[in-house]
Swiss-Prot record:
GO terms for biological process: cell division; cell wall organization; peptidoglycan biosynthetic process; regulation of cell shape; UDP-N-acetylgalactosamine biosynthetic process. UDP-N-acetyl-alpha-D-glucosamine binds at R102, R131, P132, V133, D134, L135, K172, V173, S174, V175, D317, I339. The modification 2-(S-cysteinyl)pyruvic acid O-phosphothioketal is found at C126. The lineage of its organism: Bacteria, Pseudomonadati, Pseudomonadota, Alphaproteobacteria, Hyphomicrobiales. The gene is murA. The keyword Cell cycle applies. It is an enzyme of class 2 (transferase). This is UDP-N-acetylglucosamine 1-carboxyvinyltransferase. It comes from Rhizobium leguminosarum bv. trifolii (strain WSM2304). It comes from the Bacteria.
């Protein structure tokens, strides 16, 4: 099993190209099930989750064609992939594959909309809380579907003639459920209005792609999304938006290690709240023509309190990384997690490096320390794993992170990008 070895104490200086967003690419890939034409996606990151979803889509009848091999050029990290689903050959999404990645459960929306029925395993993925599927079930039921849970599977059936447009308001914001109901509603009869919809940029990206395919969606990026159903969707060509979580992660890495790094192929508008929080912590961040510049030269790290919230609030997917940064602050900070109920699994691993963190319910109190010391640590989930890498960049001596398959699910060639900026980071294969 691979490990990541980090020797701390080196500033980061250089250029890091940001990959396409995993959280946008996955629903965009699943949208290929809605049409018999070819959907071409540019800027698709090379990640374990993307590879797994390609296998899952292939089982449903999607032909996947990748444009050549991944180029080893400085600015070439992501790929162009063509998805063609002439006929859906299997409406069952098996436990064997779906249990490995929660987002693969989202095929339930397009399969139900296009075929009128499907059998989809309950999901797996990161071990963060319970992450129930109730919101998905309620949203699709509002469109007229009947949903039955049997032996770990959901048997879904649309009414005769297909799904029916409706008004539905989510009791709580859910990005995944917004994706699924929006995709399903594109082929429903009549108009669907989704209330309390997720406002994340990835939702907007999916809506833009669906509109390019012939859907009629308005309001994406607000709390109310309106979808006028159409009889069919066509193919399209769409570029996956930059990964705001990867952007924020590397910005926090620079704030932690110090240095001066340009993040290319990204957009400051994608994460205003997180970047403003980083500025308060002492980072110097400015927009460039094709991204942003992040600097922290000499100044210490200031303590800042955060509360995670749905977009445009502070992203839960950057919570662990920010906590790692706060371990080196000059005072006491607090991190409150409101999205997931069990997203502090990285705390005990950061403590192995010398961090002082105490938990009280959904709030972590972090007392900044003058130094961290390298040690063997273990990744517990995707975002927690990269927080350990960030901490290792500033720790004295050597830090080794095991179970890095979590990293490979969401960060494209992380060790290569950091090494190019002066970090001592290497992958050790065993």
């Amino acid at each position: 099993m691979d490990r990541i070895r980090i020797v701390g104490g080196n500033e980061l200086n250089g250029i890091i190209p940001i990959s396409g967003a995993k959280n946008a690419a996955l629903p965009l890939m699943i949208a290929s099930l809605l049409t018999s034409d070819t959907l071409t996606l540019e800027n698709v990151p090379h990640l374990a989750d993307v590879e797994l979803l390609m296998r899952i889509l292939g089982n449903h009848g999607v032909d996947v064609a990748v444009n050549g091999r991944r180029e080893r050029q400085e600015d070439s990290y992501s790929r162009t992939i063509h998805f063609t689903c002439r006929t859906i050959v299997d409406t069952t999404a098996s436990y064997e594959l779906v249990s490995k990645m929660r987002a693969s459960f989202w095929v339930i929306g397009p399969l139900l909309a296009r075929e009128g029925h499907c059998r989809v395993s309950l999901p797996g993925g990161c071990a963060i809380g319970t992450r129930p599927v109730d919101l998905f079930i309620e949203g699709l039921t509002a469109l007229g579907a009947t949903m039955e849970i049997d032996a770990g599977y959901i048997n879904a059936k649309a009414p005769n003639g297909g799904l029916i447009g409706a008004r539905y308001t989510f009791p709580k914001v859910s990005v995944g459920a917004t994706h699924v109901v929006m995709m399903a509603a594109t082929l429903a009869r009549g108009t669907t209005v989704i209330g309390n919809a997720a406002r994340e940029p990835e939702v907007v990206d999916l809506a833009n792609c669906l509109n390019a395919m012939g859907a009629k969606i308005s309001g994406a990026g607000t709390a109310t999304i309106t979808i006028e159903g159409v009889t069919s969707l066509s193919g399209a060509r769409h570029r996956v938006l930059p990964d705001r979580i990867e952007t924020g992660t590397y910005a926090m890495a620079v704030a932690m290690a110090g240095g001066d790094v340009v993040l290319e192929n990204t957009d400051v508008a994608l994460l205003d709240t997180a970047l403003e929080t980083l500025r308060r912590a002492g980072a110097d961040i400015s927009a460039t023509n094709n991204g942003m510049r992040v600097k922290r030269n000499g100044a210490g790290i200031k303590p800042v309190d955060i509360v995670t919230d749905p977009f445009p609030g502070f992203p839960t997917d950057l919570q662990a990384q920010f906590m790692a940064l706060m371990t080196r602050s000059s005072g006491i900070s607090h991190v409150t997690e409101t999205i997931f109920e069990n997203r502090f699994m990285h705390v005990q691993e950061l403590a192995r490096l010398g961090a002082r963190i105490t938990l009280s319910g959904q709030t972590a109190k972090i007392e900044g320390v003058q130094r961290l010391r390298g040690a063997p640590v273990m990744a517990t989930d995707l975002r927690a794993s990269v927080s350990l890498v960030i901490a290792g960049l500033a720790a004295e001596g050597e830090t080794t992170v095991s179970r890095v398959y979590h990293l490979d699910r969401g960060f494209e060639r992380l060790e290569e990008k950091l090494t190019r900026c002066g970090a001592v980071v290497e992958r050790i294969s065993e």
